[in-house]
Amino acid sequence: MKRGTQGNIVLEGEVRFCGERIDRLEPHQIRRRGLVHCPERRRPFRELSVMDNLLAGSYLSSDAADTQSKLARAFKLFPRLAERGKQIAGTLSGGEQQMLALARALMFEAKMIAIDEPSLGLAPRVREDVFKAIAAIHAEGIPILLVEQEITQAFRMARRNYVLSQGRIIAEGSAADLQADQTLRASSLGL
């Protein structure tokens, strides 16, 4: 599914967003429709500054006031990025790079953000900050598709959960329902 949201080939089924089939579109066409992917391992433009990374996220907007409004929103959510605006993105810590990736996603006018493994490689305290930021983004009304192996945290955040095994959905439901399934707990959830 993630690959389908990025414009990669889907071998079986289809990916739809806002009623439109998107799995055959190019990544830039998908972004224009408001579905933004925040990739695993963050992937900032390492040689660019924090500010230039954020501005790269607003390339679809030609309105300077709109861009400034988006920057203010990103800096309100991630004040540390405002402090590091001129710093080269490749020199940021892993947690700061994750914050930058989320802030850049907000700059795209996201209607939905697909976030891939946001806690990967982060210290526990930083992980908590990142998940708080994701919750704040969701509280603004932006739906989040969260792919996360930190299952306890994912269960705390999600209204609906899907458990995948080898690319197939093997269970779905609320966190309480999935945690109550003893077979699933032992085989897939690691609980």
Regions found by a protein language model. Give the residues of each.
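Glycine-rich phosphate-binding loops of nucleotide-dependent enzymes
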Residues: 1-191
